[in-house]
């Protein structure tokens, strides 16, 4: 329950909102000191383990890289770094908003938290765009499906997010009060209006725009997959049903993890400057704190999603060792004098043409047939 205290007064009985510097309302946040340490701890351990396994597969088992695997690798790096930033926050909230470390480390932890959160969002966007091009324009996507282009895009994503999150190092600070040092995730009172403006820009640039792009991509893919093939009738083939379900799961996870967090955080920041009742502000504050673990859970769910979408990675993880023998077409390529990069491009073309042929077989197969092939997204 929140109570009016007057602007910039101290709090009573340890119920001061740890993210605020002398705000006019006093919030009862005892639930936060249980919810956040437990939820961050639950996310941290499996998040590190799952993404470590993913990175092992990418670095040690995967021999051929394309745009999709490149984006997934950087997504795994981002999620692993995000999970690695959680132990200090677990300790901080378990101690009741007491930060025994330096101000520099406080700034760094908050910076890593938001940097890797938004890197994950942008790499999910890159994967979605790549899949969309592969479904809608499979041949034209060959040029942009090369690993070297994906590496450039991934590098641009890291530079963009690091540049956008650099102001966090300026805004975030610590404050001592009643023998307790608080590591704020906002700013000092005199900078709060600027921080809200900055957060609004980041909301649009690093969440709203990527979310809209992902939504459009998956709607277009679903429309293409749900469109009946020429000369066929009956229900949707099993492969297409599976692909549509995968699309629905990706959208649901993205919306569940990121949308509530960003909506409640925007309301939390915006309404603090309005003359609202403390009861309303306390409800918004509680909603914001509850949605924080949802955003963190994405680092555990991402490995499951891209393993489901990339069945080739699952085979690499399952097999004792990756195939090393030459493909049947290798001697012919050697006779033609193709370089390694040319052979890679040839293989990519064959994969796409093979996928197109599989898609045509799928579309011509009656509903319920056991010969239906999976469509690669």
UniProtKB/Swiss-Prot annotation:
<keyword id="KW-1133">Transmembrane helix</keyword>
<feature type="topological domain" description="Extracellular">
    <location>
        <begin position="173"/>
        <end position="194"/>
    </location>
</feature>
<keyword id="KW-0472">Membrane</keyword>
<feature type="glycosylation site" description="N-linked (GlcNAc...) asparagine">
    <location>
        <position position="13"/>
    </location>
</feature>
<feature type="topological domain" description="Extracellular">
    <location>
        <begin position="270"/>
        <end position="287"/>
    </location>
</feature>
<dbReference type="GO" id="GO:0097746">
    <property type="term" value="P:blood vessel diameter maintenance"/>
</dbReference>
<dbReference type="InterPro" id="IPR017452">
    <property type="entry name" value="GPCR_Rhodpsn_7TM"/>
</dbReference>
<keyword id="KW-0812">Transmembrane</keyword>
<feature type="topological domain" description="Cytoplasmic">
    <location>
        <begin position="310"/>
        <end position="377"/>
    </location>
</feature>
<dbReference type="GO" id="GO:0038023">
    <property type="term" value="F:signaling receptor activity"/>
</dbReference>
<feature type="transmembrane region" description="Helical; Name=1">
    <location>
        <begin position="33"/>
        <end position="59"/>
    </location>
</feature>
<feature type="topological domain" description="Extracellular">
    <location>
        <begin position="94"/>
        <end position="110"/>
    </location>
</feature>
<dbReference type="GO" id="GO:0070257">
    <property type="term" value="P:positive regulation of mucus secretion"/>
</dbReference>
<feature type="compositionally biased region" description="Basic and acidic residues">
    <location>
        <begin position="339"/>
        <end position="363"/>
    </location>
</feature>
<feature type="transmembrane region" description="Helical; Name=6">
    <location>
        <begin position="247"/>
        <end position="269"/>
    </location>
</feature>
<keyword id="KW-0325">Glycoprotein</keyword>
<feature type="disulfide bond">
    <location>
        <begin position="106"/>
        <end position="183"/>
    </location>
</feature>
<dbReference type="GO" id="GO:0045028">
    <property type="term" value="F:G protein-coupled purinergic nucleotide receptor activity"/>
</dbReference>
<feature type="transmembrane region" description="Helical; Name=4">
    <location>
        <begin position="153"/>
        <end position="172"/>
    </location>
</feature>
<feature type="topological domain" description="Cytoplasmic">
    <location>
        <begin position="60"/>
        <end position="70"/>
    </location>
</feature>
<dbReference type="GO" id="GO:0006873">
    <property type="term" value="P:intracellular monoatomic ion homeostasis"/>
</dbReference>
<comment type="similarity">
    <text>Belongs to the G-protein coupled receptor 1 family.</text>
</comment>
<feature type="region of interest" description="Disordered">
    <location>
        <begin position="318"/>
        <end position="377"/>
    </location>
</feature>
<dbReference type="GO" id="GO:0045030">
    <property type="term" value="F:G protein-coupled UTP receptor activity"/>
</dbReference>
<feature type="topological domain" description="Cytoplasmic">
    <location>
        <begin position="130"/>
        <end position="152"/>
    </location>
</feature>
<keyword id="KW-0297">G-protein coupled receptor</keyword>
<feature type="transmembrane region" description="Helical; Name=5">
    <location>
        <begin position="195"/>
        <end position="220"/>
    </location>
</feature>
<dbReference type="InterPro" id="IPR000276">
    <property type="entry name" value="GPCR_Rhodpsn"/>
</dbReference>
<feature type="topological domain" description="Extracellular">
    <location>
        <begin position="1"/>
        <end position="32"/>
    </location>
</feature>
<feature type="transmembrane region" description="Helical; Name=7">
    <location>
        <begin position="288"/>
        <end position="309"/>
    </location>
</feature>
<protein>
    <recommendedName>
        <fullName>P2Y purinoceptor 2</fullName>
    </recommendedName>
</protein>
<feature type="glycosylation site" description="N-linked (GlcNAc...) asparagine">
    <location>
        <position position="9"/>
    </location>
</feature>
<feature type="topological domain" description="Cytoplasmic">
    <location>
        <begin position="221"/>
        <end position="246"/>
    </location>
</feature>
<keyword id="KW-0807">Transducer</keyword>
<dbReference type="GO" id="GO:0031686">
    <property type="term" value="F:A1 adenosine receptor binding"/>
</dbReference>
<dbReference type="InterPro" id="IPR000356">
    <property type="entry name" value="P2Y2_rcpt"/>
</dbReference>
<dbReference type="GO" id="GO:0007186">
    <property type="term" value="P:G protein-coupled receptor signaling pathway"/>
</dbReference>
<comment type="function">
    <text>Receptor for ATP and UTP coupled to G-proteins that activate a phosphatidylinositol-calcium second messenger system. The affinity range is UTP = ATP &gt; ATP-gamma-S &gt;&gt; 2-methylthio-ATP = ADP.</text>
</comment>
<keyword id="KW-0675">Receptor</keyword>
<dbReference type="Pfam" id="PF00001">
    <property type="entry name" value="7tm_1"/>
</dbReference>
<dbReference type="GO" id="GO:0005886">
    <property type="term" value="C:plasma membrane"/>
</dbReference>
<dbReference type="GO" id="GO:0007200">
    <property type="term" value="P:phospholipase C-activating G protein-coupled receptor signaling pathway"/>
</dbReference>
């Amino acid at each position: 329950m929140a109570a009016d205290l007057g602007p910039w007064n101290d709090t009573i009985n340890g119920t001061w909102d740890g993210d605020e510097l002398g705000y006019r309302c006093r919030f009862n946040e005892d639930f936060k000191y249980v919810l956040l340490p437990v939820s961050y701890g639950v996310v941290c351990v499996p998040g590190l383990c799952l993404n470590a396994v993913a990175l092992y597969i990418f670095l040690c088992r995967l021999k051929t890289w394309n745009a999709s695997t490149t984006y997934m690798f950087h997504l795994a790096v981002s999620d692993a770094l995000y999970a690695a930033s959680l132990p200090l926050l677990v300790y901080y909230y378990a101690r009741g908003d007491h930060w025994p470390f330096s101000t520099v480390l406080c700034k760094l932890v908050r910076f890593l938290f938001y940097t890797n959160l938004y890197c994950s969002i942008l790499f999910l966007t890159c994967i979605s765009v790549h899949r969309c091009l592969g479904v809608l324009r499979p041949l034209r996507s060959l040029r942009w499906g090369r690993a070297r282009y994906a590496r450039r895009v991934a590098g641009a994503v890291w530079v963009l997010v690091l540049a956008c999150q650099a102001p966090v190092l300026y805004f975030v600070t610590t404050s001592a009060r009643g023998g307790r040092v608080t590591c704020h995730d906002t700013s000092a009172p005199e900078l709060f209006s600027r921080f809200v403006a900055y957060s609004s820009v980041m909301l649009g640039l690093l969440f709203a725009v990527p979310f809209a792009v992902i939504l459009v991509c998956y709607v277009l893919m679903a429309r293409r997959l749900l469109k009946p093939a020429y000369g066929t009738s009956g229900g949707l083939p099993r492969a297409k049903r599976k692909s549509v379900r995968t699309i629905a799961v990706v959208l649901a996870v993205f919306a569940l993890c990121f949308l509530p967090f960003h909506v409640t955080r925007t309301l939390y920041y915006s309404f603090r400057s309005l003359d609202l009742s403390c009861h309303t502000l306390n409800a918004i504050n509680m909603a914001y704190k509850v949605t924080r673990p949802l955003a963190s859970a994405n680092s555990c769910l991402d490995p499951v999603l891209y393993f489901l979408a990339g069945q080739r990675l699952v085979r690499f993880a399952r097999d004792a060792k990756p195939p090393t023998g030459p493909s049947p077409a290798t001697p012919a390529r050697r006779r033609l004098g193709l370089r390694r990069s040319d052979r890679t491009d040839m293989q990519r073309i064959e994969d796409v043409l093979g996928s197109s042929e599989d898609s045509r077989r799928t579309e011509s197969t009656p509903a319920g047939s056991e010969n239906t092939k999976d469509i690669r997204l």
